[in-house]
Amino acid sequence: AKNIIHRDIKPANIMVSPKGYFKLGDFGVARQQISGTMTVIGSYDFMAPEVYKGMPYDQTADIYSLGMVLYYLANDFKLPFSEIQSSIDRINRRMNGDTEWDWKQKLSSWGIATNIKQKMSEEILYDTVMTACANDPKARYQSATAMKRDLMICMDKICTLEKRKDNWEAAKKK
């Protein structure tokens, strides 16, 4: 819906329809976008820094939260600083610009990428997630449409790599 800020995007609020479409649920704390929205509401682990600080925020706060969901999914269901017990301490570490959560440094240690396609897809997804999760709202995607465009490019590149792999496997069998 246009001009609606969900304010609590997290994995528990994302459902999959019978046809395989992702749907955002639980609009209990959503509200129409009003200039200078400042209410602190949502889940700390997926909350944008400006929301946590009680500063004015807009739709880019939801983009940040979606970026955190993508990070969580790509990082084997772990958030930045998951070893820290307190969600408030975790958000403070993210906001302080601690580079330890820069997942590009962790790509090789995840053990997820077992082939070139996976390595490449992680690198492509990295830029999208880090843009969505920028601490500065002006450095983030300014619309869901812009983020969707980059995610579609990412998917296209991953599918292209998969097709090349399939062609390579077929050629090796000949």
Q: Where in this protein do the model-derived segments appear?
A:
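Conserved activation segment of eukaryotic-like protein kinases, specifically the C-terminal portion
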Residues: 38-51
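Conserved HRD-motif arginine in the catalytic loop of eukaryotic-like protein kinases
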Residues: 140
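Protein kinase catalytic-loop region centered on the HRD/HxD motif
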Residues: 1-4
